[in-house]
Structures are given as structure tokens and as C-alpha cells.
């Protein structure tokens, strides 16, 4: 029925009742009695009552209409429930992390092509393409199914099961425990292990309309399965673990840790700095014999004799007074000219005084 008819009918009835009550005159007793109740209603009051009733009626009508249009007539679905359902679905759709995916071994197809069991070609169950000899395969150790690394990587980001056999790849296979029963009398005897009987898991068939598997029930999965001898399988797993361990540790290179360059030890003695600082001269001598430095001091054997008469070891630094300048000796022989005179089996050497840089026998150059 038309909603306007529902609205007009009560309003007309209300107006009729108001007009009838207003047209009835009061009794004489009620007009003279000051406390008597007057049943008359003014027209303004009647209009106010009608407007209020009509407003309430329209509010209820539009409320029902809006709820009907939004599809929430029964009010059973709430926003909180919808948000909770979306969070639950997102949690269920979460797959394996990248570290777990990288633990599955990879190898080149040509390494196992001639040794695999079976004559048929291997295919990737996700892209349904045959493997080429130079392509890399990723093996799932729990079910021996092989895929392209990028194909199975994209699948495992949203799933935790194998796309062929639905094996849960996130579960860790527990090792069977051995229970040993002993008592006081059997402590000296060998323990008897009690075998643990494990019941096989029974999986009920599921509907294939949810997209949890890429292989139809009853379809042959031999072309997706890599069957190789057990020795070759162990070798593949061992090589994969070795490659992963080598990729983590890097051996340091040999050589000097300071400059990274090899040092020519033959020129280490002669190619050094000679420092002259006013009022002293600094020089280190590691040779044997007696060396006289311009009359300022001498070295005999392994000791240095200064003008004051003090002696120090020749392999230490000697400070002598001389003019100050700095040069570097680049020749493989000592820069001062040394004269050797053997007297009584004692080696004596004298060094001419170095007045200028050009007076040395070796090539001396000032540092830039």
C-alpha cells in the first residue's frame, strides 16, 4: 500500500475526534463549578498535537526504510565482527618468511638430469613449463617436488603448504624419543629400549574449490617430483649446506693491515728519514764498527762514545749537535762515505763530516 494513505488515515480520524469534542457544549453544573474539568480543546493545541504525532510517524518510517536499504535489517552483522573476520582471514593467508624459503636447496637441472629416476621430463607445477638444462630448481625436502625459485617463492609468501601435495612446510618433524625403563635390579644390565609406535596421519579429503592446491585430485604428480638415488640426494643437501656456510664467512686477505702493500725489506734500512733539529742531530745506527761523526762523537763496537765520555748502545738513537735540516736517503747504501781501517782485529770506521747535502756519496733529496 502507498505510505501516504497510511499517514492520511490516522490524521483524518484525529481531526474528526477533535471536532466532535469541541462541538459538544458543557452542562450548566460544570459551567458554574469553578473546579469542574473542561473538555474543550483549542484549535492551536490540536494542531501542535497533530504535528508532533506526524513527526514521530515520519521518523519511524524513514528509520525502517534506511535500514532496509543498507541491508542490515536484522542487525546481526556489526562493524566490529566484520573487522575481526578480516583480521582472521589475513592471519590465515600469511605464508613462510624469506629465511625459511632460503633453507630449501637449489641446484642446476643439468646436474641431476642424467641421474634421476624416471624417463619423463620434469615440470614446474606452478607455471607448467619443462625445466631447461641451465635452469635452477628449488627442491622441497619433505616431498621432493621441484619448482622454479621465483614461482615457489611467490607461492610460499601466501601459503605454508606444498602446491602439489599440501605438505605443511612450516612444521618441524619431531624426532622419535626412546624411553628406557630401569629398576634397582637392572642397573648393572644393559638398558632395553622401548620402541615408540607412531600412527600415520590420516587426512580427510578437502574440497578443491578453495585454491589451496594447483594439482587436481587423482592427477599424476610424477612430472613434478624429482626422484634421485639416496646418495645423490645426500650430496645435494651437503653441497647446499656447504655453499650457505661459505656465503656467510669470508676469509681475510693476507698482507699488512696498515697499508695493504708489500714492503721491500732490502731498502728498509737505507730508505728512511734523517732528522736534524737544532741543537741536536738524530740518527739510528745498527751497523758494527767504530764510526766517528765529524769529531763530535764515535761509535765503537756496539757502543756510542759522546764528547763527554758517556757511552750508549749503537742500536739506539744518538742525539748530536749540528745545524738543522731534514732530508731523506733513497739509496740502498748508507749515505755517508765510510772508510774502514782494520787495526789489531778491531774494526774502526770513520765518517766524514756532512757539511752540505751535496757532499754525501748517496743521492739525497729534500721531501716535497
Curated annotation (Swiss-Prot):
Presence of the UniProt keyword Heme in the record? no
Which pathway does it take part in? Protein modification; protein ubiquitination
Highest taxon of the lineage: Eukaryota
Gene3D superfamilies, A to Z: Zinc/RING finger domain, C3HC4 (zinc finger)
Q: What happens when the gene is disrupted?
A: Hypersensitivity to C/N conditions during post-germinative growth.
* Positions where Phosphoserine occurs in the chain: 247
Zinc-finger (RING-type) residue ranges come to 124-166
Span-the-membrane segments of this chain are 46-66
Q: What does the induction field say?
A: Up-regulated by chitin. Down-regulated by abscisic acid (ABA).
One Pfam family name from the record? zf-RING_2
Give the UniProt record's GO annotations in the biological process aspect: cellular response to hypoxia; cellular response to nitrogen levels; defense response to bacterium; defense response to other organism; protein ubiquitination; response to abscisic acid
Could you say which enzyme class this protein belongs to? transferase
Q: Compositional bias (Polar residues) at which positions? A: 347-368
Q: Give the UniProt keywords, A-Z.
A: Membrane, Metal-binding, Phosphoprotein, Plant defense, Signal, Transferase, Transmembrane, Transmembrane helix, Ubl conjugation pathway, Zinc, Zinc-finger
Instruction: Report the principal subcellular site.
Output: membrane
Q: Which residues form the signal peptide?
A: 1-23
Give positions of region: Disordered.
342-368
List the catalytic activities from the record.
S-ubiquitinyl-[E2 ubiquitin-conjugating enzyme]-L-cysteine + [acceptor protein]-L-lysine = [E2 ubiquitin-conjugating enzyme]-L-cysteine + N(6)-ubiquitinyl-[acceptor protein]-L-lysine
Fetch the InterPro entries from UniProt: RING-H2_zinc_finger, Znf_RING, Znf_RING/FYVE/PHD
Entry GO terms, CC: membrane
Provide the topology term for how it sits in the membrane: Single-pass membrane protein
Domain note: The RING-type zinc finger domain mediates binding to an E2 ubiquitin-conjugating enzyme.
Name the family the entry cites: Belongs to the RING-type zinc finger family. ATL subfamily.
- Give the protein's biological function: E3 ubiquitin-protein ligase that is required for the plant C/N response during seedling growth transition. May be involved in the early steps of the plant defense signaling pathway.
Alphabetized PANTHER family for the sequence: E3 UBIQUITIN-PROTEIN LIGASE ATL31, RING FINGER DOMAIN-CONTAINING
Q: What is the recorded name of this protein?
A: E3 ubiquitin-protein ligase ATL31
Taxonomy of origin reads: Eukaryota, Viridiplantae, Streptophyta, Embryophyta, Tracheophyta
Q: What gene name is listed for this protein?
A: ATL31
Amino acid at each position: 500500500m502507498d505510505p501516504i494513505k497510511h499517514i492520511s488515515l490516522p490524521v483524518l480520524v484525529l481531526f474528526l475526534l477533535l471536532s466532535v469534542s469541541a462541538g459538544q457544549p458543557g452542562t450548566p453544573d460544570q459551567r458554574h463549578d469553578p473546579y469542574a474539568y473542561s473538555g474543550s480543546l483549542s484549535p492551536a493545541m490540536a494542531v501542535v498535537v497533530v504535528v508532533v504525532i506526524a513527526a514521530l510517524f515520519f521518523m519511524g518510517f524513514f528509520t525502517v526504510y534506511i535500514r532496509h536499504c543498507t541491508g542490515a535489517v536484522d542487525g546481526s552483522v556489526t562493524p566490529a565482527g566484520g573487522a575481526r573476520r578480516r583480521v582472521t582471514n589475513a592471519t590465515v593467508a600469511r605464508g613462510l618468511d624469506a629465511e625459511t624459503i632460503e633453507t630449501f636447496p637449489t641446484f642446476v637441472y643439468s646436474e641431476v638430469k642424467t641421474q634421476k629416476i624416471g624417463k619423463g621430463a620434469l615440470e614446474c607445477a606452478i607455471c607448467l613449463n619443462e625445466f631447461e638444462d641451465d635452469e635452477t630448481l628449488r627442491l622441497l625436502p619433505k616431498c621432493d617436488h621441484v619448482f622454479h625459485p621465483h614461482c615457489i617463492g611467490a607461492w610460499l609468501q601466501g601459503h605454508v603448504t606444498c602446491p602439489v601435495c599440501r605438505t605443511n612446510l612450516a612444521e618441524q618433524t619431531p624426532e622419535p624419543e626412546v624411553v628406557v625403563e630401569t629398576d634397582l635390579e637392572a642397573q648393572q644390565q644393559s638398558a632395553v629400549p622401548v620402541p615408540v609406535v607412531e600412527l600415520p596421519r590420516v587426512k580427510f579429503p578437502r574440497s578443491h574449490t578453495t585454491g589451496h592446491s594447483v594439482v587436481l585430485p587423482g592427477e599424476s604428480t610424477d612430472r613434478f617430483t624429482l626422484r634421485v638415488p639416496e646418495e645423490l640426494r645426500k650430496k645435494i643437501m651437503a653441497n647446499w649446506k656447504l655453499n650457505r656456510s661459505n656465503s656467510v664467512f669470508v676469509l681475510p686477505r693476507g698482507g699488512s693491515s696498515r697499508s695493504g702493500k708489500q714492503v721491500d725489506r732490502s731498502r728498509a734500512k737505507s730508505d728512511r728519514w734523517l732528522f736534524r733539529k737544532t741543537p741536536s742531530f738524530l740518527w739510528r745506527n745498527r751497523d758494527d764498527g767504530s764510526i766517528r761523526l765529524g769529531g763530535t762523537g764515535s761509535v765503537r763496537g756496539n757502543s756510542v762514545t759522546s764528547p763527554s765520555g758517556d757511552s750508549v748502545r749503537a742500536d739506539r738513537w744518538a742525539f748530536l749537535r749540528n745545524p738543522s735540516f731534514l732530508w731523506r736517503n733513497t739509496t740502498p747504501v748508507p749515505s755517508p762515505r765510510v772508510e774502514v781501517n782494520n787495526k789489531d782485529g778491531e774494526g774502526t770506521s770513520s765518517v766524514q763530516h756532512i757539511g752540505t747535502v751535496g757532499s754525501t756519496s748517496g743521492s739525497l733529496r729534500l721531501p716535497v
